[in-house]
């Protein structure tokens, strides 16, 4: 049975059989009072000063806990999970330590934290202890139209049209990458040469089968496909830039930098083509521009990183590499030492061999790297007994060197992967909100008939419940405990789509 009571503003007003919250003017006497809390039939007893350490919580605020006071039994009654209250009470006794009991599920314990109003700090402690991903909130634009556009292009899971735009973006990225790879096939290069015949000028580099045509570029099918892809990339980038809530933060985002890198090579190539059309130019200058174009075209391959915007797998890989930078640095350092040692050793071991494939120590660097990574192309091999011994030691040292930091990197990957997958499954538990039961008028009538309260006491209880209802609703409108969350912020951990 739960009976609510009112807001006691006068210290002289009290309840029969309930000395706990009588607002005695002597603070020492008040702090030593005991409070009995009944959790679904299991009674707990603690001191009032223990609960008053956290006055903003449900049990620490006399006004809030009055709603659950039973004057007949002189105790507070809560029809809640009993095992969870051990940790809740210890939270007050320890001054803020919170640890979930092993026999209490995550969703139930998170709901109890919200019910007893322990606060966001306690919830954050619980999330960190349980390995939850820290919820990162990013502001949304204030303008409603910009907000809808931003959600449409930035968060694919926000709506159905946003998913469609994400699918279009991924398709365009794949088309661009496929086109970039196919245009280097000899069959397409031969077709381009036959198509333009002698009307085109071709330039080649020594020891290279790649030739570049310097005329009729704008009629090339691959150039047309590239232009269409760039139109979409540019449109997407401009829309996201115009709709973003902060222009400064927009350009510091790594994904936006990748978008810029994916677009710029096209316009540089286009400007170079137009410049060569308007000048006679010398062959040396054209060869230099071709060398620049080759580097710029290579940058186009980085468009594949645009897929990480829509892929959780790539994001997990990036987090793993970022967390494993120390181990990767040690791996590179160990390989560097091994390459120097074994390339020097194999050079001197093969120095007396007439047909030695190691004319110098720098030439042996490649062999040492290939051997330590256990690839073994076979393009450079030792022929003497000493050289073969050095090669064997090099391979063994490479296996040991690589094997040492790899488990740490794999462990980091497993951590981020399981944290992401478990975070998705458990995210719904963190969003569960539980509103305390507010006694209704029938409850008051029932308690009135079953108790020995006087009419004046009953009227005070009823008036207090009315004030309590108003305070509770007003607070929850501010904190969004029982309503929708702040619509001007979005949790980015829930706005990812797995491709």
From Swiss-Prot:
UniProt membrane topology term: Multi-pass membrane protein
Segments for region (S4-S5 linker): 312-325
Transmembrane segments: 161-182, 222-243, 255-275, 290-310, 326-347, 389-417
Residues listed as glycosylation sites in the UniProt record: 207
Chain location of the short sequence motif Selectivity filter per the record: 374-379
Region listing for Disordered, in residue ranges: 1-27
Cytoplasmic side: 1-160, 244-254, 311-325, 418-499
GO biological process, one term: neuronal action potential
Keyword set, alphabetical order: Cell membrane, Glycoprotein, Ion channel, Ion transport, Lipoprotein, Membrane, Palmitate, Phosphoprotein, Potassium, Potassium channel, Potassium transport, Transmembrane, Transmembrane helix, Transport, Voltage-gated channel
Localisation per UniProt entry: Cell membrane
Listed GO MF terms: delayed rectifier potassium channel activity; voltage-gated potassium channel activity
GO cellular component, one term: membrane
Residue spans that sit within the membrane without traversing it, per the record: 362-373, 374-381
Catalytic activity line of the entry: K(+)(in) = K(+)(out)
Family: Belongs to the potassium channel family. A (Shaker) (TC 1.A.1.2) subfamily. Kv1.2/KCNA2 sub-subfamily.
Record note on quaternary structure: Homotetramer and heterotetramer with other family members.
Function: Voltage-gated potassium channel that mediates transmembrane potassium transport in excitable membranes, primarily in the brain and central nervous system. Prevents aberrant action potential firing and regulates neuronal output. Forms tetrameric potassium-selective channels through which potassium ions pass in accordance with their electrochemical gradient. The channel alternates between opened and closed conformations in response to the voltage difference across the membrane.
Comment on protein domains: The cytoplasmic N-terminus is important for tetramerization. Interactions between the different subunits modulate the gating characteristics. The transmembrane segment S4 functions as a voltage-sensor and is characterized by a series of positively charged amino acids at every third position. Channel opening and closing is effected by a conformation change that affects the position and orientation of the voltage-sensor paddle formed by S3 and S4 within the membrane. A transmembrane electric field that is positive inside would push the positively charged S4 segment outwards, thereby opening the pore, while a field that is negative inside would pull the S4 segment inwards and close the pore.
Protein name from the UniProt record: Potassium voltage-gated channel subfamily A member 2
Organism: Xenopus laevis
Lineage: Eukaryota, Metazoa, Chordata, Craniata, Vertebrata
């Amino acid at each position: 049975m739960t009976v609510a009571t009112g807001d006691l503003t006068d210290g002289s007003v009290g309840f029969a059989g309930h000395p706990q919250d009588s607002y005695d003017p002597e603070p020492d006497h008040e702090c030593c009072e005991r409070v009995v809390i009944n959790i679904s039939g299991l009674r707990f007893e603690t001191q009032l000063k223990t609960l008053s350490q956290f006055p903003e919580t449900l049990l620490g605020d006399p006004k809030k806990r009055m709603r659950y006071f039973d004057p007949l039994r002189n105790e507070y009654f809560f029809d809640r999970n009993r095992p969870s209250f051990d940790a809740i009470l210890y939270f007050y006794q320890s001054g803020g330590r919170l640890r979930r009991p092993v026999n209490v599920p995550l969703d139930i314990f998170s709901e109890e934290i919200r019910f007893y109003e322990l606060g966001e700090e306690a919830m954050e402690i619980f999330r960190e202890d349980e390995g939850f991903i820290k919820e990162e909130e990013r502001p949304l634009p204030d303008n409603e139209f910009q907000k809808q556009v931003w959600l449409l292009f930035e968060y694919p899971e926000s709506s159905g049209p946003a998913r469609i735009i994400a699918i279009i973006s991924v398709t365009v990225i794949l088309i661009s990458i496929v086109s970039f790879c196919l245009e280097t096939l000899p069959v397409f290069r031969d077709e381009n040469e036959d198509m333009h015949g002698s009307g085109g000028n071709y330039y080649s580099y020594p020891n290279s089968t790649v030739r570049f045509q310097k005329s009729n570029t704008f009629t090339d099918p691959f150039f047309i496909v590239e232009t269409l892809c760039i139109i979409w990339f540019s449109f997407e980038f401009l829309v996201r830039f115009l709709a973003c809530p902060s222009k400064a933060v927009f350009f510091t985002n790594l994904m936006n930098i990748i978008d810029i890198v994916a677009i710029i090579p096209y316009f540089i190539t286009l400007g170079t083509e137009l410049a060569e059309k308007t000048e006679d130019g010398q062959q040396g200058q054209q060869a230099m521009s071709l060398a620049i174009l080759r580097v710029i075209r290579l940058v186009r391959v980085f468009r594949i990183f645009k897929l990480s915007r829509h892929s959780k797998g790539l994001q997990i890989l990036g987090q793993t590499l970022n967390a494993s930078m120390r181990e990767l640095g040690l791996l590179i350092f160990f390989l560097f030492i091994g390459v120097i040692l074994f390339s020097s050793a194999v050079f001197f071991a093969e120095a007396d061999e007439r047909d030695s494939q190691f004319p110098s120590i720098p030439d042996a660097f490649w062999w040492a790297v290939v051997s330590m990574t256990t690839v073994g192309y076979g393009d450079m091999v030792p022929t003497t007994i000493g050289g073969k011994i050095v090669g064997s030691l090099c391979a063994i040292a490479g296996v040991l060197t690589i094997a040492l930091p790899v488990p740490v990197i794999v462990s980091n990957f497993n951590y981020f992967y399981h944290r992401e997958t478990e975070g998705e499954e458990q995210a719904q538990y963190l969003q569960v909100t539980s509103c305390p039961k507010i006694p209704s008028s029938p409850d008051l009538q029932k308690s009135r008939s079953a108790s020995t309260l006087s009419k004046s006491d009953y009227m005070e209880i009823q008036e207090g419940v009315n004030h309590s209802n108003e305070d509770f609703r007003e607070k929850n409108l501010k904190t969004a405990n029982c309503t929708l969350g702040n619509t001007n912020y979005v949790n980015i951990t829930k706005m990812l789509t797995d491709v």
